[in-house]
Amino acid sequence: MSAPTRNEDPELSRREELTVSSSAMSGAPWKTAGAAGAIVAGGDLALHLAGGHLAVPTALSAGVVALFAVAGGGTLLRSQSGRAMRWARNHPWRFALMPGAAAAVVVFVLSVLIGSSGLIGGAFTAVWHGAVVYGLTGLAGTVGGSRKRRDA
């Protein structure tokens, strides 16, 4: 059995992947992500108000999706270096689990506490919002990563 070379990524356990993803997310563009989340939530709330009804939980959920999608995608597209960032760029779909799961947890809490959803409805809402963030983050890493490799 040969030892992996320095350029080769050793396989990480699921727990180690979450730790590395958390480390990479610490370098996320949080101000930009927060602004995107606020704009999306405000726009969604304005559209609902124009339609004649107040839908705060829906607007907040849309804002959470924008917040975590921009944070996750921005993390992968930033030019920061480090082992965690290198791992995240090389494994964008595995990295995307972190922002997707975080969005799902926040949306679940919002929909159960503020919204009219019960536990089952809140879980369904959380899963599909998390899936959207997962897809957008993974796509940003895949497309942005391939463009960076092609340009280099």
Predicted regions and their residues:
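Juxtamembrane/disordered regions of integral membrane proteins
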Residues: 2-152
